[in-house]
Regions:
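ABC family nucleotide-binding domain
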Residues: 8-9, 14-212, 216-219
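ABC-family P-loop ATPase nucleotide-binding domain
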Residues: 1-17, 226-236
């Protein structure tokens, strides 16, 4: 993040400890991280290193055990669940490896519904515009089961970005896709994030995808590894 710029997301000495049958498990261990406006950050590291938990805590979906998480300058610990949801609404969006589309809604309804919930006008028209932007003008009335994996992720991208968020969290956004489709979805994601001016926090195992970010951080054993990053060994 550029020095002196305001953070859209800041984590300070954040820990996350979860119970297990074998006893408490330290998922995050003293994480410090700041993401500036419009910055594209890739988070890499082996499975189980805390990458997805970092996104969950940063987005306010999981409460840390200790430390401070500030989203758009707001201390998430001072907000209840409804308050965190209101803070995210229209300003933060999420895309996951699993597409999380509502199966009983068409593509255009999946994109329009969050806009309607947020009180936006012309939600259906905006949804259609965004589905056109992701190359799916011919899939407006198709249900998720009628779409390929790549098409479902494009719908998820359109849904996430239609409200023109300030920050997009993406957890393995191309993880369920073949190489060709993954490249197409990645191109779309980076182009549309730039178009709306959003910051991006992206978890990925893909070194090619990671290298498209402005900055890469590596997670190891619940901490940010400050050593030299070799993107050719992301899964090591």
């Amino acid at each position: 993040m550029a020095e002196g710029s305001a953070s859209v997301l800041a984590l300070e000495a954040v820990t996350l400890t979860l119970p297990s049958a074998a006893g408490p498990v330290n998922i995050l261990r003293g994480v410090d991280l700041a993401v500036g406006p419009g910055e594209r950050l890739a988070v890499i590291g082996p499975s189980g290193s805390g990458k997805s938990s970092l996104i969950a805590v940063g987005a306010g979906l999981e409460q840390p055990t200790s430390g401070v998480v500030r989203l758009f300058g707001q201390d998430l610990a001072r907000l209840d669940e409804d308050g965190r949801a209101r803070l995210r609404r229209g300003r933060a969006a999420l895309v996951f490896q699993a597409f999380h589309l509502l199966p009983n809604m068409t593509a255009e309804e999946n994109v329009a519904t969050p806009l309607e919930i947020a009180g936006g006008r012309d939600a259906l028209a905006i949804a259609r515009q965004w589905l056109d932007r992701v190359g799916l003008p011919h899939r407006l009335t198709h249900y998720p089961h009628q779409l390929s994996g790549g098409e479902q992720q494009r719908v998820a991208l359109a849904r996430a970005l239609a409200a023109r968020p300030v920050l997009l969290f993406a957890d393995e956004p191309t993880g369920n896709l073949d190489a060709k489709t993954a490249a197409t979805v990645a191109d779309l994601m980076f182009a549309l994030v730039a178009e709306v001016g959003a910051a991006l926090v992206m978890v990925t195992h893909d070194p090619v995808l990671a290298e498209r970010a402005d900055r890469i951080v590596r997670m190891a054993d619940g901490q940010i590894d400050t050593g030299k990053i070799d993107t050719g060994k992301i899964d090591a």
